[in-house]
Amino acid sequence: MRKLLLSIFLALGTACWAQERIPIILDTDIGDDIDDALALALALQSPEVDVRAVTTVIDDTETRTRLAWKELGLYGRHDIPLATGASEPLLDPVRPQRARQFEVLTDADTVPEAAHRRAAGLIIDTLMASPRPMTLVPIGPLTNIALALKSGPNIRPKIARIVLMGGAFHMLYQEYNIWRDRVAAEIVFSSGVPITAVGLDVTMRCKLEGADLARLRAADNPAARFLTKLIDLWQDGHPSQFPTLHDPLAVAAAFQPNLIETQSGSVQVETACCVANGMTMFKPADQLPRGVNATTLIAREVNVRGFLDLFLARLTAPPRAK
């Protein structure tokens, strides 16, 4: 009887734990900077997170989708729906350059037919099918998220929060993710959906170098070796640089928000001034006019060592069971 009760207790505990996992959709421009592939790995390796879908965004999204599918396979997660997103921003298309990380792909790295569907459609369908609100984690330009919000305005109650990597809130700087599709960014920030914005001025403190990088390189499993290969390809084009973990910090903030300190307020994206296009203007909650809601939390500080320890523990471990 005692063994039976223990089995029931463990089963109930496991079920409760599973229900508490945070359902997320990860939207990524994987293949450019190295941090996207590392962020996807962190999401897949974190038991607090239930990755319900992955979508790709901007430029050569077909090849980005192939790279994401290859990484999902190395972690045993071809069960996760994948979709190809918008290849151009809502304004001002820019001719893309081919990313070095795509060199890991071969002719055998194809994707299922379902992955050719539009990302905004997958985002909408996944949100509407979820019994509980979900967290969106966009770590590239916000084109797909803006398209989903415009195409499916009824999805807003289904979004618990958007945790994004983007912006620069303590310095005058045109951070790439926001600048690349500033119109989409303004749509997202003005949507009324709760947002946590992890900006460049905080993520720049999170470098993967020295003993930390050596620890990842020493990890002996196929997924970690794949990440190391991507780092090598990226460093070939950036020989004097070490990976900066912009996107992984946003992923971590989605399930361990205590890693960052935040401030509440409102964000406006500059879209009309040539010199300042793409800059993010933050106004703290106590300075907002009456009737204007503070829907955004911006990151102000980060526990760098705590984040790096979490990141390395997850990415050096063998791929976990889903």
Specify the residue positions occupied by each region the protein language model found.
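Sec-dependent signal peptide recognition
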Residues: 2-7
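Hydrophobic h-region of N-terminal signal peptides that target proteins for export
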Residues: 9-18
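Glycine-centered secondary-structure boundary/capping sites
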Residues: 14, 73-76, 257
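Active-site histidine-anchored catalytic micro-motif
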Residues: 20-30, 34-70, 109-211
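Conformational coupling and interaction surfaces
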Residues: 20-21, 39-45, 50, 179, ...
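Metal-dependent C-N hydrolase catalytic cores
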Residues: 20-21, 63-129, 294-303, 307, ...
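Histidine-centered active-site/metal-ligand motif
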Residues: 36, 101-102, 144, 246
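Acidic/polar N-terminal loop/beta-strand segments that form early-domain functional surfaces
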Residues: 55-59, 85-87, 272
